[in-house]
Regions:
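A generic structural signal for ordered alpha-helices
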Residues: 7, 24, 45-48, 52, ...
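Conserved hydrophobic/aromatic pocket- or pore-lining residues that grip, position, or stack substrates
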Residues: 29, 46, 87
Length: 125
């Protein structure tokens, strides 16, 4: 319970299929950095997530690369090098919305929610 979850849509952070941050990402990342500075007491987890399009291994690799990009930006641009970051990719394994409808149709709105990066800040040791 002693955590803050920041969820940032991959659409804000990255172009389709990319792990290089877009300039539209910076204000969200600056606000995340402020929360980290104000609240973090312990490790900060950064987890990349994808939707179910593409192969499992591709999505795993992409989600890891995206999480690393966020960590690297926070360390370099927000000067958070004193904090310990645990970076991981979850691929398509932890959707927050269904990737398909009950009828088996594609669910673009659900998939959009699923490709994201989560920053989990521990607020007590």
């Amino acid at each position: 319970g002693n955590e803050i979850l920041i969820e940032i849509s991959a659409d804000i952070l990255f172009d389709f299929d990319e792990s290089t941050l877009k300039s539209s990402a910076f204000s969200s990342l600056r606000s995340a950095a402020k929360k980290i500075r104000d609240s973090a007491r312990g490790d900060i987890r950064i987890e990349g997530h994808t939707d179910s399009k593409g192969s499992d291994s591709y999505n795993q690799t992409l989600s890891e690369a995206r999480a690393r990009s966020v960590r690297d930006w926070l360390v370099k641009n927000a000067r958070l090098s004193d904090f310990t970051f645990i970076v991981s990719g979850r691929g398509e394994t932890k959707p927050v919305q269904p990737n398909q409808t009950d009828q088996g149709e594609d669910n673009p709105a659900g998939r959009q929610r699923n490709h994201r990066v989560e920053i989990i800040i521990k607020t007590s040791e």
